[in-house]
Amino acid sequence: MVTLTNAESVLKTVYLDVVSNQLNTEINPFLAKIKQSTEDVWGKEVRKLAPFGINGGIGAGTEDGNLPSAYGNQYVQFVSTLKNLYGAIEISDKAIRASSNSVGAFVNLLNAEMEGLLKASAFNLGRMLYGDGSGLVATVTTAGTGSCVVDSVRNLIEGLAVDVYVGEEKTAAAKRITAIDRDTKTVYFADVNLAVTAGAKMYVQGSYNNELTGLGAIFSDSNTLYGVDRTAHRWMKPYVKAVDGDITEIVIQQAIDRLEEVNGSKVD
């Protein structure tokens, strides 16, 4: 017979590893290219010593002349806090009792919920990779009650639950999106009485300033990244090539050459 104890065991021993593996390896081509390691994790932080520039103890000279002065490598320490991505499912006791005499029925119930959770986790983790860590998914451009128009629906999807902020104040929590008109950028909420003002910002529930440091943060104009002052260490500012006309192979190659010559990067 399937019991709550059995269900807990299945979730821990069967599903946890599967979900973790799929999120780490199958969620996004960009994530798959990033080397993953835990060796720089210390407690609740990630600390990585990063060299920059070159060793300065180099110089030409005569056979019996003085050796060049010794200048060692230069380092900065990157510091970031660990981030948590939670996923929760809920199965009522009635659903468990209804399938208590059929292991197959209960497994199907778990499979459906876990697949849905994995899809939601994949969507949000993929979004975070390109975000700025704030959890911001949209800004309201036209106010409304039960619905509103936003600046972009790229990071929104039916079923997503969002918190609404006006400035630093949370005015609504965990409001679920039921429908999206992607042509008009109109978002509809399950709470038909929800009043949303223009300029309000939507964040994934509970994620305000708690998400991964994605490309949005790396390419932002902020002066600090991973605890390092980017005004003092200008090499930490990512290279952006402005293009007035069409993006051609020559333009792409010029950008690649710059990265290889200046940064020693190997562009994939």
Question: What name fits each language-model region?
Answer:
Residues 52-67:
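Long, contiguous juxta-domain segments that are non-catalytic but functionally important
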Residues 1-54, 71, 77-268:
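Core alpha/beta structural scaffold of self-assembling particle/tube/pore-forming proteins
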